[in-house]
Amino acid sequence: MSKAFASQADLDVKQVSFTKLSDNAYAYTAEGDPNTGIIIGDDAVLVLDTQATPVMAADVIRRIREVTDKPIKYVLLTHYHAVRVLGASAYKAEGCEYIIASHDTLDLIRERGEQDKASEIGRFPRLFQNVESVPPGLTWPTLTFTGKMTLWLGKLEVQLLQLGRGHTKGDTVAWLPQQKILFSGDLVEFDATPYAGDAYFKDWPATLDNIAALQPAQLVPGRGAALTTPEAVAAGLAGTRSFIADVHEAVKAGVAAGKDLNAVYKDTMARLTPKYGHWVIFQHCMPFDVTRCFDEVTQYPDPRIWTAERDVQMWKALEQ
């Protein structure tokens, strides 16, 4: 292989930021690593995405405890990926009663959760360096919904919304309508490359339109710094939209020209690297993103299951 697989060469510890967006909303970010959102209500706390392991989740909990002693009653899984959900067990000791996800996310956990767990542990050795702290099995939602669910944390309204397919078929955002703060999960990234190995390229732009229609004043992306002004939110949405569209257009052009996946990948890398090559995990994501986009454009409307074995086979084929 001409370059290290996925994020196996990414061993540098990232600097954590704990950003206050309002009296009720915080963002746990770490220089492009997966983010966690925190919503503090009158009587309970909701955590959005758990971190990759209970050891990593413990740092989130430590920072929450610096600002509130209220029980962490709710954990929301914005989607099914292991790097987002396998820290969930750490929150049980902090009062967690409900693990919430869309029913579409539950379907994905049932269908491909085990394969994704093995795959992501191989892709992200730094994030999973304490993988022994993850209990056996998977993180299972205990409460699911379709379309929309409203939680009342005392007087604070929290809307959990499915605004369309994009990063996965089960993506959920959390919306504080009283404060116009949105937690997007991996539907939006900022200065970080969208992972699109399980994506719906044709649908993702319309889902971003639905996010924009809410007119968030602040937004916590899946990766990257919290966006704390409407201008920053617009930039985050625009960057994500541009990347998804550019990959899609490059792949469609290659397929129309009769090129195979390997040639399409090389063309797409050449086309996108000048614009996005400085984004976090660009080199990691692109083989997966182009492969999925090629699948969608040619013969697979729904994403195929990634396994640890398929990961390595694909990487060797595209990066040799």
Predicted regions and their residues:
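Divalent-metal (often Zn2+) His-rich catalytic cores of metallo-beta-lactamase-fold enzymes
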Residues: 175, 203-263, 267
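Conserved beta-strand hairpin/beta-sheet module of binuclear metal-dependent hydrolase folds
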Residues: 18-63, 172-186
